[in-house]
């Protein structure tokens, strides 16, 4: 817990904190942002680590294709579409009276097979890695084998001797629960107070043990970690500090490169790429950012998006204290409809590794998320959960907020913006039950009718 004096000292040093503490929307440009060639020197991971993760996912593709028929057409590769959303771009420009230069795309991790969110990348990857490690160590397989053999009673019996434990606000729990149970593991998911009921119900229907907590995400992770430590057959998936989750997310960047090439979209010195990533604890956006920087270096600019009531990564980066600060220290309640982003304390791993790599962070109010959700349905017929819309707000904020424009000018991008590509990373949505999604849409329409006047003024 930070003292009152420390908070006051920071408010003096960072005047933007006053606005953050009032739970108002802000756009923050990272003053520690460096050229990637310089920034990577302090990062303990390299491209070979990501390539190794990609290779492992390839080994598991025959198993995935067999166990999850919906992945067969993609031959067991878990990937999502990248789509142009020009109608939504026009709607954004109209809603917020802002001209967005360049093209706007949506990366639909909301529609990833198996668990319908970005967590299908990191979560599924880490479980598969653990399964491979166990199977190799026990002589069940060798690296050259066809991993489709894992979809058998023999392997399910073997994996049932082991358990997986994770703490989650929802989507990570879904991905680990679904893949873990399918392999045969005993899975326990500890869920925080803000987790949606339908996510708990879905997990239970797959045979996963769900333990509900009244506390917030960080306390839940602590409890899950403690429970796992008591059982020698248990493996704890650490959302706050896992390198394996991080690498699973990073693989996305190399696949995105191919998708952009297939769409004839150039990314180079004169064609900058801007990527806007919803951020909870930071593992998902952190891994994707690291991967994108490996692929595009300084030609890609990654911004994290957080709810106004849960800006944990923003506070960690701004103060340089990372996981030593929480949103509660600054008088914020960590309550948001963006359940996947309701995190009070950021990942130390991501904050430390990427403090010179993340271009900036902006915050979005729940009402803005709902308005964008309704607009996305009306313009593109794409259904997303509220947290996924945080990334879609990015281009408006970049062009409308003073700090966004300062970033563009400071990086010599002003004349290049007409050639820019903007990608909002849609993190979840396809598994939301129809009635819940309908209620989200109605809420968006209601707020739009009431307000209809854009974001709060940029600061």
From Swiss-Prot:
Residue positions where N6-(pyridoxal phosphate)lysine is found in the record: 119
Q: List the PROSITE patterns.
A: DEHYDRATASE_SER_THR
Q: What's its catalytic activity?
A: D-serine = pyruvate + NH4(+)
Note the superkingdom of the native organism. Answer: Bacteria
Identify the cofactor(s).
Answer: pyridoxal 5'-phosphate
Give the Gene Ontology MF terms in alphabetical order: D-serine ammonia-lyase activity; hydro-lyase activity; pyridoxal phosphate binding
State the Gene3D superfamilies in the record.
3.40.50.1100
Pfam families assigned: PALP (PF00291)
InterPro entries assigned: D_Ser_am_lyase, Ser/Thr_Dehydratase, Ser/Thr_deHydtase_PyrdxlP-BS, TrpB-like_PALP, TrpB-like_PALP_sf
Q: Which residues cross the membrane?
A: none
- Write down the EC number: 4.3.1.18
The record's keywords, sorted A to Z, are: Lyase, Pyridoxal phosphate
Q: Which residues form a coiled coil?
A: none
Question: What is one process in the GO biological process aspect for this record?
Answer: D-serine catabolic process
Q: Which family does it belong to?
A: Belongs to the serine/threonine dehydratase family. DsdA subfamily.
Name used for this protein in its record: Probable D-serine dehydratase
Q: Which gene encodes it?
A: dsdA
């Amino acid at each position: 817990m930070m003292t009152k004096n420390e908070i006051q000292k920071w408010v003096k040093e960072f005047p933007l904190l006053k606005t953050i503490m009032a739970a108002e929307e802000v756009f923050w440009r990272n003053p520690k942002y460096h050229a990637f060639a310089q920034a990577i020197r302090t990062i303990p991971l390299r491209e070979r680590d990501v390539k190794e993760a990609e290779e492992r996912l390839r080994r598991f593709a025959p198993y995935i294709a067999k166990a999850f028929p919906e992945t067969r057409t993609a031959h067991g590769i878990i990937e999502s579409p990248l789509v142009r959303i020009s109608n939504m771009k026009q709607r954004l420009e109209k809603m917020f009276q802002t001209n967005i230069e360049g093209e706007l795309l949506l990366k639909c991790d909301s529609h990833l097979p198996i668990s319908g969110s970005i967590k299908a990348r990191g979560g599924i990857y880490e479980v598969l890695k653990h399964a491979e490690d166990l199977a190799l160590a026990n002589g069940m397989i060798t690296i050259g084998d066809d991993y489709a053999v894992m979809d058998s009673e023999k392997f399910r019996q073997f994996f049932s001797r082991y358990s997986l434990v994770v703490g989650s606000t929802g989507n990570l729990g879904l991905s680990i629960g679904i893949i873990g149970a399918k392999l045969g593991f005993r899975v326990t998911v500890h869920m925080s107070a803000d987790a949606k009921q339908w996510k708990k119900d879905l997990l239970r229907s797959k045979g996963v043990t769900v333990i509900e907590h009244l506390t917030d995400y960080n306390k839940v992770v602590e409890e899950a970690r403690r429970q796992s430590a008591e059982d020698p057959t248990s493996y704890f998936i650490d959302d706050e500090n896992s390198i394996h989750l991080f690498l699973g997310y990073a693989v996305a960047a190399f696949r995105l490169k191919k998708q952009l090439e297939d769409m004839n979209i150039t990314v180079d010195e004169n064609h900058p790429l801007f990527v806007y990533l919803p951020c909870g604890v930071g593992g998902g956006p952190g891994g994707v950012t690291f991967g994108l920087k490996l692929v595009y270096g300084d030609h890609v600019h990654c911004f994290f998006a957080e709810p106004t009531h849960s800006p944990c990564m923003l506070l960690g980066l701004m103060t340089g204290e990372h996981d030593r600060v929480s949103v509660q220290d600054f008088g914020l309640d960590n309550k948001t409809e963006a359940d996947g982003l309701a995190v009070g304390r950021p990942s130390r791993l991501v904050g430390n590794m990427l403090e010179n790599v993340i271009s900036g962070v902006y915050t979005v109010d729940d009402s803005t998320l709902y308005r964008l959700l309704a607009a996305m349905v009306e313009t593109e017929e794409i259904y997303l959960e509220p947290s996924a819309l945080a990334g879609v707000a990015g281009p408006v904020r970049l062009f409308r907020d003073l700090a966004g424009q300062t970033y563009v000018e400071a990086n010599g991008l002003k004349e290049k913006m007409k050639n820019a590509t903007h990608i909002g990373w849609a993190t979840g949505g396809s598994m939301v039950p129809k009635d819940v999604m309908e209620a989200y849409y109605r809420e968006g329409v209601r707020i739009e009718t009431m307000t209809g006047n854009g974001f709060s003024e940029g600061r």
